[in-house]
Amino acid sequence: MGMDRIADRAIIDGKRFAAGLLDDITARVKKLEEETGQVPGLAVVLVGEDPASRVYVGSKHRQTLAAGIASFKYELPAETTQEELMALIDRLNVDPAVHGILVQLPLPAHLDANAVIQEINPNKDVDGFHISNAGRLATGQPAFVPCTPLGCLLLLKDRLGANLSGLHAVVLGKSNIVGRPMVQLLLAESCTVTIAHSRTRNAPELCREADILIVAVGRPGLVRGDWIKPGAVVIDVGINRVEAEGKSRIVGDVAFEEAGHAGAITPVPGGVGPMTIACLLSNTLTAFCRQHAVNID
């Protein structure tokens, strides 16, 4: 089963979609600057030397600037105390130039990440992790939505159309970052939603019933071809680095080369990943508009 079995039309090109979204955001930021004399500002806080986090923060910084959004990068040493980090968040909460605050996870082990996230002003919580935003999302109220699930939903609607009502969606993974908010978004679209995770006894059978299959477990190639219903739309959120024949490559949670019978699938890399940063900047633009009571369009 070679990769040639997956027709080009079945590949969901997240890179292309994200580029279009970024073009739209850039144009809106320019218009806002002309009308208000101000631009949205995003503060990103990185604690310690985690190499993957440094790469992510660098990429976010570049793309933020490219969209015309002000980027404030705070790189703190690994030994930063809880009090020091909370004090920085408190300063950013009241800084009028900062409309969105993102704390890059994971934090060093001695820091309480949940306490840090809850310290962020919910109106500046562009990652959508604050309990206020999570609660609003769960009860169907306007909220900042975590960037990865939001990106997944945009890709689904681009492929399936705006109306997802009645489709059976299976979400594999129950993290607060992807799985749980994804379930809430799909419920809001009137999908029938099943959530499965590492303790689920019959995960393959459940997945085989899915019209929409979203996989976010961090286990390379866990979902095999026979887990996928013919014609299903598969969104692979996994980003796993694997070593093979002395080389390192990035793969998803789905055995991509076995998914030729899927109706559509996101590749890894180039699927969900680019959407996450685009949605972060979209949330930052929304935060600016809400804080200044200006129309986003």
UniProtKB/Swiss-Prot annotation:
Q: What function does the entry list?
A: Catalyzes the oxidation of 5,10-methylenetetrahydrofolate to 5,10-methenyltetrahydrofolate and then the hydrolysis of 5,10-methenyltetrahydrofolate to 10-formyltetrahydrofolate.
Task: Name the GO terms of the biological process aspect.
Answer: L-histidine biosynthetic process; methionine biosynthetic process; purine nucleotide biosynthetic process; tetrahydrofolate interconversion
Can you tell which superkingdom this protein's organism belongs to? Bacteria
Pfam families from the UniProt entry: THF_DHG_CYH, THF_DHG_CYH_C
Q: Does the keyword Kinase apply?
A: no
Question: InterPro entries in the record, alphabetically?
Answer: Aminoacid_DH-like_N_sf, NAD(P)-bd_dom_sf, THF_DH/CycHdrlase, THF_DH/CycHdrlase_cat_dom, THF_DH/CycHdrlase_CS, THF_DH/CycHdrlase_NAD-bd_dom
Keyword list (alphabetical) reads: Amino-acid biosynthesis, Histidine biosynthesis, Hydrolase, Methionine biosynthesis, Multifunctional enzyme, NADP, One-carbon metabolism, Oxidoreductase, Purine biosynthesis
What is stated as this protein's family in its record? Belongs to the tetrahydrofolate dehydrogenase/cyclohydrolase family.
Instruction: Identify the residues that bind NADP(+).
Output: 173-175, 198, 239
- What pathway is this protein said to act in by its record? One-carbon metabolism; tetrahydrofolate interconversion
SUPFAM superfamilies recorded for this chain?
Answer: Aminoacid dehydrogenase-like, N-terminal domain, NAD(P)-binding Rossmann-fold domains
Gene Ontology CC terms: cytosol
What is the protein named?
Answer: Bifunctional protein FolD 2
Write down the species.
Answer: Sinorhizobium medicae (strain WSM419) (Ensifer medicae)
Q: How does it assemble?
A: Homodimer.
Q: Which GO terms describe its molecular function?
A: methenyltetrahydrofolate cyclohydrolase activity; methylenetetrahydrofolate dehydrogenase (NADP+) activity
What is this enzyme's catalytic activity, as reactions? (6R)-5,10-methylene-5,6,7,8-tetrahydrofolate + NADP(+) = (6R)-5,10-methenyltetrahydrofolate + NADPH; (6R)-5,10-methenyltetrahydrofolate + H2O = (6R)-10-formyltetrahydrofolate + H(+)
EC no.?
Answer: 1.5.1.5, 3.5.4.9
